[in-house]
Amino acid sequence: MTAPQHPLKGRLALVTGATRGLGRAIAVSYAKAGAHVIAVGRTTGALEELDDEIQKVGEPATLLTLDLRKGDKIDGLGPTIYERWGKLDIFVGNAAMLGPLSPLPHVTADAWQHVIDVNLTANWRLIRTLDPLLKLSDAGRVILLSSGAAEGRYAYWGPYAVSKAGVECLGKMYAAECENTAVRVAIVNPGATRTAMRAKAFPGEDPMTLPAAEDVAPLFLDLARPESTVHGEIVRYREWVAAQATAATAK
């Protein structure tokens, strides 16, 4: 059994978009919980800065500089991980881009495709290459990130909203296909969070009114635990916080 302070001891976790915002907070929290983290990001310098932080709380991370638009590079990831570790316990599909906030008729084909490639297609390709490794784990965990934008209520958020709606469907479909395995799939809607992407989308908003990424990371730790039973569900951070508070009061 794992020690309470290291609930992910001995687990191998891959986190995309790990160099900033929520992805960074998740990667650090997993390392602190005892996991070995494969941190995926676009720039080597930012990954090295993350590793400096991770080494203060856990073992050095494995750093992977990867452009998620490069499908052939993603496809080779599964075999590479298998050759070195033989399995994968946790996959967090966090990487995303906002794209243009513009009327749909004004979005260029290239801009549309860029957002879909990074936010949706990359997660499908990652699932495809990592699926055999997750099924070799005694408790494979997949956590994909959605957004309130996926509900289609926000004008001018077209590419991002569509990509996140696709992620929700992708997660639910994969969950259905993993029903009779040890893999559990969760889709997380973190809600408004104090990140650079949020600041870009809402420049007039006071960021101090929002939870920090480090506040949201415990939800991802909870879902990554081997004992987590959440499967095929959309988990909303604020609802999770409320449920945690209710459970604590009941004790």
Short names for language-model regions:
Residues 33-49:
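Conserved glycine-rich Rossmann-like NAD(P)H-binding loop of the short-chain dehydrogenase/reductase
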Residues 12, 19-20:
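Conserved glycine-rich cofactor-binding loop
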Residues 11, 59-60, 87-88, 134-147, ...:
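Active-site loop of short-chain dehydrogenase/reductase
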Residues 102-104, 111-116:
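Substrate-binding pocket helix/loop in short-chain dehydrogenase/reductase
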Residues 45, 65-76, 109:
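The beta1-alpha1 cofactor-binding region of Rossmann-like NAD(H)/NADP(H)-dependent oxidoreductases
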Residues 180-183, 187-188, 195, 204-251:
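C-terminal helical subdomain
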